[in-house]
Amino acid sequence: MSLAKLRTHYTADVKPEKVDNGQKITLAGWVHEVRDLGGICFVVLRDREGKAQVTLVKKKIDKELFDAARRLVRESVISVTGSVKFEEKAPNGYELLPEEITVLNVANSPLPMDTTGKVEAELDTRLDSRFIDLRRAETTAVFKIRHQALQATREYFVQNGFIETATPKVVATATEGGTALFPITYFDREAFLNQSPQLFKQILMSGGFDRVFEIGPIFRAEEHDTRRHLNEATSIDVEVSFADHFDVMEILENLVAYVYAQVIEKCKPSLETLGIELKVPKTPFLKLTYNEVIEIINARSEEKMHWGDDLGTFGEHIVGNYVYETTGESHYFIIDWPTEIKPFYAMPYEDRPEYSKSFDMMHRTMELSSGAQRIHIPDLLKSRIESQGLNPEGFEFYLKAFEYGMPPHAGWGMGCERFIMTMLGTENIRDTVLFPRDRRRLSP
């Protein structure tokens, strides 16, 4: 059977400006609900774009068709051909008066979980039966928004002269020298799943690519088991030649504002489904120095932060709330971090080398992005690698790119899932991933 016979329209396509009253159409999807009232039967058909009411009046329709509709099993796959009747009280403002209902696949009963929203399910239950959970309107809405956010991200980069790249995910050495790596067997050698495209982005700067971005998977073998950590995630990465950290911060904040604006414009039904009202963040974002952050935390907490400490969850909450209370905005930057707590490739200030030209972009109580101007001077880079207890020989492929004309450059990486999580106010980062991989979950 051809696609044209199974479906001519999505449910959301049936509008007075597109479809005539009485026009014959074919919808296809899942049986969301069956309401049998004796003399009348309502079948709610659900597809990717929404729901449509199929109305069968016993006295006006073939008995065999009426009885078949009453027997439909929830979540079975059907195709319905009939005539459109615009009706204000019906879902989406119309109902379909069927001439033919074809059952394409019958669902087992009972279902592993409810899809109507009448019965709540725990996240683990939903993830165990993800194929059913993805049929829920709220779940679908999240991934439609994620799709639009990534599409807008690509649009923004292309409009601003970036080249999209794809770097290796199987590597011979750690990107940042950490131990949080997944080892794999690569024929007769040990290899790792890449934790960041960082080193390859910088090599591309030596290659003259000038402005690059990548949207791809990263892998972190960290044993965190929290609502905001994943072991496989999607990273949005940027690298720009002839730029410093302030230049790429501007690119980042403008990207965030652009994506929000596009989601607001193009995802109205999904935002309504989730009950969310977004506003475009104001740019430029507030910039706080690391030292200012220490002062803010220590003035508001008995638990003190000392120079050289990372921010920590408690500090993120204090500073994020301070920024929101004073500016009404959620996004902000923390700049000028101590050199020793940033990766080896972060450029130190010439006049105060204990500080680096680095930044984190925050959203209230969560880090979304980390970036810096990079070291482009070979001797300094090698020295920084050694100072962090790493062997430069393991980075030979990377260091060579700096010996034959590396321009000054800067960049950042941002976690896609955290970006979506904070945009939508999602409680758990796993809600923003189709099939999340965390410390405890490897299936489905």
Curated annotation (Swiss-Prot):
Q: Name one GO biological process term.
A: aspartyl-tRNA aminoacylation
- Positions bound to Mg(2+) 2: 367, 370
Q: Where is this region: Aspartate?
A: 198-201
Tell me which species this is from.
Methanosarcina barkeri (strain Fusaro / DSM 804)
Any GO molecular function: ATP binding
Residues noted as binding ATP in the record, renumbered to the chain: 220-222, 228-230, 367, 415-418
The entry's protein name is Aspartate--tRNA(Asp/Asn) ligase
Keywords annotated in UniProt: Aminoacyl-tRNA synthetase, ATP-binding, Cytoplasm, Ligase, Magnesium, Metal-binding, Nucleotide-binding, Protein biosynthesis
